Amino acid sequence: MQIVSISSLKGGVGKSSVALGLVSAALIEGTRTLVVDLDPHADATTGLGVRAPSGRNVGKVLGKRGKPGALRTVTVTSPWAEREREEQGKDDLVLDVAPGSSASSLFDRAQYRRSDLARLERALEGVDTDYDLVIIDCPPNLNTLTRVAWAASHKVLSVAEPSLFSVAGTQRTMTAIAQFERGTRWAVNSAGVVVNKVHPDSREHQHRVEELDHLFGELLVAPVLPDYQVWQRAQGAAWPIHRWPGEDAAEIAGRYSQILEGLLSAEP
């Protein structure tokens, strides 16, 4: 089982969109997937069509100080999987969600306590028999919840957009990962940068992608992700991009499948 955190320093770069695109690719490939929505805004939960019962959210698990295996008590099945099973006749598909909620914000302090960092790691104990992939959607900051996610993860993907401010933010994120490893007992085995919302015809965007390539080299994940309106329509309908019609949707879906293949082919 591979555990991957999707991080960003600020909102607006499409962090949750990247998480949803990877989940869509995993669903189509038949990869048994669990989504842990640590973002108090719960955009990934909404995008996956999940309406969780009251009290059934990841904040409840964190409040138990990371009881071993506790995440199983709050997971629900995404309608994406239910629909795919019905329409494609694939009864063995697995896509579960540990829903996000504003309750998680109680733990998202700027200054973290070392005793808090293992909460999610412990809550995930034992789920490796149920899933091949865990995607953690982090809050758009570098506070406690993001570091709780890093402590539980094998890999971290930092989402950037091709802008001056995002390039600087990505540098700070990668520096923070290195500092996290030096200052705690946890090690992130792999980190990468995904470039989202790229306008292929924009010289400014081309320049920023080249700048990111220069800064991060092999850590820059290929391919980049274009900013097509069809992706917004698919998300608005809470629909997997791999099942949305049209050439633009197919192109985006193919790129997410490539990124997922790279993630799963590397050792955790």
Could you say what each language-model-derived stretch is?
Residues 1-268:
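P-loop NTP-binding core
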